[in-house]
Amino acid sequence: MREMYGEKMKIWKRFINMFMCIMICAQMCVVNIYAEETQNEPEELYARSAVLMDADSGRILFQKDGENVMPMASTTKIMTCILTLENMEDGQTGMASDYAVSQPKVHLGVRSKEEFYLEDLLYSLMLESHNDSAVIIAETIGGTVEGFAALMNEKAKELGCNDTYFITPNGLDAEDENGIHSTTAADLARIMKYCIMDSPEKDEFLKITQTKSYQFSDVKGERSFSCTNHNAFLDMMEGAFSGKTGFTANAGYCYVGALERDGKTFIVALLACGWPNNKTYKWKDTRKLMEYGLNNYEYRNVWEEVKSKNVLVENGVDKANPYNSEVYIHTKVANEDKELSILLKKSEKVEIQVEQDEKIEAPVAKNEKIGTVTYFLDGKMLKQYDVVTVNAVKEKDLLWCINTLSREYLL
């Protein structure tokens, strides 16, 4: 009995040891997978708030407190620029008011009632970040600075930037009864996406922000001015193609910029990225985030041929068999390209959800929508396609009954 008991104990110990080995191996696999996913994520960013966005889809790939509301300094001017491009007339001019003249540095140094072409002032705005140029532009397009700020806030809401509030066209620290001049890194990236990807004036915006230097004069030609682009990131990384710097005492150093390489386009937005004497922090953070995007994300075609079900058409006419009581109609997914390329990490998986009517009432038109196919990533919708009918189905109405009976019994 003792020998039998001892043998059972040995077997039991072997089982426990084997079970423990399996559990340890499984845990190590989970740890390794997690480590592989996180080892390349940007760490120790200087910015208090940061976002890396896929500019094509608008999906945020990485963020550090990206939804925190903070002042954004002269990165404000990307909104000022794009609104002006979309609203100004060819050859339109603006006159410097006393308020414009009073703007603090950095400024162009305009004189009261001096007149400029708005196109020239946009280069002053974006290359040198001149605060007085921003006010001339705002008062010309919006009637007043307050009127222009209202346009800025309206556009922000259109773009889904619900945590953004504009008071000034130049980004100087400001506060009123509704709050402070502020945004989030996520909203700032959304505004930049609009400027470089979606606006009808995106080409002009890029032309201005990519210009190295620019010369112009006032309308009368009495004074000449020269502007130099201070966006050092343009020469810092291959593929960098647009951006805007900013600084105020409250906002600290801020930056929003874009890069395109290997068919991938990224936007980085940084808020509160150091204070003097740490002017270069924003470039270090921008490079780190851009390299993270380039090294970890690739386009993948996630399109799948979804087998949409045939749908019962109640009271429908079957051409092949008019007396058939059950008529089914073929369906398809309305995507002629048969392709859906999404910027993804290796481990990211897209889920597909099909929603389709089980039955519909006749008459049914060709290409009539009867459902959707939706692609999700981490619970968020990436893309949605309609499920439509392949052909039309007529209704068994009174006229159809009369015609059918006539053909059957009278002809």
Show the residue positions of the predicted features.
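Active-site-adjacent loops and short helices of periplasmic peptidoglycan-processing enzymes
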Residues: 6, 30-203
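Sec-dependent N-terminal signal peptides of Gram-positive bacterial secreted proteins and lipoproteins
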Residues: 11-34
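Short, intrinsically disordered/low-complexity patches at protein termini
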Residues: 27, 84-87, 141, 146, ...
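N-terminal secretory signal peptides that target proteins for export/translocation
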Residues: 1-11
